[in-house]
């Protein structure tokens, strides 16, 4: 009890001291400021900090802190970019099966006008379907053409129809949950065609040079038909080709003349036939000369064959004429003998 009374007295004494000090300050400096203790203000600030729910603000904002100022990729870029997350073996098998199912279903949709007549008229051919490992996107690769404008138009039409195609796949119960479909150009065929073009250019040169070579070849091929042949030089390497050609043609004519004389054997009327032994000797001489004579163009050009040619042709002509005369004489003798036998028979009967 006495302790409580002593405490009250102490507090009253403190209040009086404070009031006295305040009055003294007003009298001396007439300042309206109040002097308070530092301990009481510090405790209030700490309580406010603990009671408030505001977080600490960062002065430097960056992508690691999730700032709203950093640029975010679009939805299309997010769906088309490759994922770096590694897949397990069982997940890869499951994804392979899903890719096959989606490829089959999407191919059937594109082959029918069920999606739209515009998509059906494009006649798009798919190369493969790839579902991401986190099942966030379904990338459908389609084969591009040569024209860049046509490829751009096809891509825009397919992207517009992607949501409706996803709705059709879900309604057909191909999968319970089909990820968003994104159509991606498969440029593998274009890359292969570019590689073939570069290899052909490395082997045969650029197209301009190849066209020039083709034009030169065609010009060479058309020269014999369009323009007359240039006249050959008469003397080449010291040889008169014109005279040589004449000699060759003369040699050919003589050969043909000899063959014609051998084949022709017309009857020359009744003439005195040579003796048989003489004819046989002439034939043997002709045969031996034809067998052993040199019938090459070289001997003809050197003039070694002219005499043999003339003599052999004459002997052969005489031999054929003699043979024809012998045959004709034998026929006449046979006719005369038949006539004589007929006369003898008539005389005997008379």
From Swiss-Prot:
<dbReference type="GO" id="GO:0005739">
    <property type="term" value="C:mitochondrion"/>
</dbReference>
<feature type="compositionally biased region" description="Acidic residues">
    <location>
        <begin position="322"/>
        <end position="333"/>
    </location>
</feature>
<protein>
    <recommendedName>
        <fullName>Putative ribosome-binding factor A, mitochondrial</fullName>
    </recommendedName>
</protein>
<feature type="compositionally biased region" description="Basic residues">
    <location>
        <begin position="279"/>
        <end position="290"/>
    </location>
</feature>
<feature type="region of interest" description="Disordered">
    <location>
        <begin position="203"/>
        <end position="237"/>
    </location>
</feature>
<feature type="compositionally biased region" description="Acidic residues">
    <location>
        <begin position="303"/>
        <end position="313"/>
    </location>
</feature>
<feature type="region of interest" description="Disordered">
    <location>
        <begin position="255"/>
        <end position="350"/>
    </location>
</feature>
<feature type="transit peptide" description="Mitochondrion">
    <location>
        <begin position="1"/>
        <end position="41"/>
    </location>
</feature>
<dbReference type="GO" id="GO:0006364">
    <property type="term" value="P:rRNA processing"/>
</dbReference>
<feature type="compositionally biased region" description="Basic and acidic residues">
    <location>
        <begin position="334"/>
        <end position="350"/>
    </location>
</feature>
<keyword id="KW-0698">rRNA processing</keyword>
<dbReference type="InterPro" id="IPR000238">
    <property type="entry name" value="RbfA"/>
</dbReference>
<dbReference type="InterPro" id="IPR023799">
    <property type="entry name" value="RbfA_dom_sf"/>
</dbReference>
<dbReference type="InterPro" id="IPR020053">
    <property type="entry name" value="Ribosome-bd_factorA_CS"/>
</dbReference>
<dbReference type="Pfam" id="PF02033">
    <property type="entry name" value="RBFA"/>
</dbReference>
<dbReference type="InterPro" id="IPR039212">
    <property type="entry name" value="RBFA_mitochondrial"/>
</dbReference>
<comment type="similarity">
    <text>Belongs to the RbfA family.</text>
</comment>
<keyword id="KW-0496">Mitochondrion</keyword>
<keyword id="KW-0809">Transit peptide</keyword>
<dbReference type="InterPro" id="IPR015946">
    <property type="entry name" value="KH_dom-like_a/b"/>
</dbReference>
């Amino acid at each position: 009890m006495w302790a409580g009374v002593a405490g009250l007295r102490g507090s009253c004494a403190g209040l009086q001291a404070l009031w006295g000090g305040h009055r003294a300050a007003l009298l001396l400096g007439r300042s309206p400021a109040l002097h308070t203790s530092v301990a009481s203000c510090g405790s209030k600030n700490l309580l406010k900090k603990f009671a408030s729910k505001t977080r600490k603000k960062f002065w430097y904002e960056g992508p690691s802190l999730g700032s709203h100022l950093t640029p975010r990729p679009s939805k299309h870029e997010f769906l088309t970019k490759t994922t770096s997350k590694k897949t397990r073996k069982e997940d890869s098998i499951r994804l392979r099966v899903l890719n096959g199912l989606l490829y089959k279903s999407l191919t059937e949709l594109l082959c029918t006008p069920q999606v739209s007549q515009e998509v059906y008229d494009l006649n798009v051919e798919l190369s493969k379907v790839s579902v991401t490992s986190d099942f966030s996107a379904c990338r459908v690769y389609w084969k591009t053409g040569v024209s860049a404008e046509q490829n751009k138009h096809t891509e825009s039409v397919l992207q517009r129809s992607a949501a409706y195609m996803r709705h059709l796949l879900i309604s057909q119960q191909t999968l319970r949950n089909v990820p968003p479909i994104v159509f991606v150009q498969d440029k593998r065929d274009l890359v292969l065609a570019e590689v073939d073009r570069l290899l052909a250019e490395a082997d045969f040169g650029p197209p301009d040079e190849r066209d020039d070579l083709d034009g030169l070849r065609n010009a060479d091929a058309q020269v014999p038909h369009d323009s007359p042949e240039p006249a050959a030089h008469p003397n080449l390497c010291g040889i008169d080709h014109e005279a040589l050609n004449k000699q060759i043609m003369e040699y050919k004519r003589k050969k043909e003349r000899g063959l014609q004389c051998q084949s022709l054997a017309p009857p020359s009327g009744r003439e005195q036939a040579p003796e048989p032994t003489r004819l046989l000797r002439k034939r043997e001489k002709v045969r031996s000369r034809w067998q052993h004579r040199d019938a090459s163009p070289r001997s003809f050009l050197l003039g070694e064959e002219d005499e043999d040619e003339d003599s052999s042709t004459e002997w052969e002509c005489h031999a054929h004429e003699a043979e024809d005369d012998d045959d004709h004489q034998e026929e006449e003798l046979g006719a005369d003998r038949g006539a004589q036998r007929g006369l003898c028979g008539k005389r005997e009967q008379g």
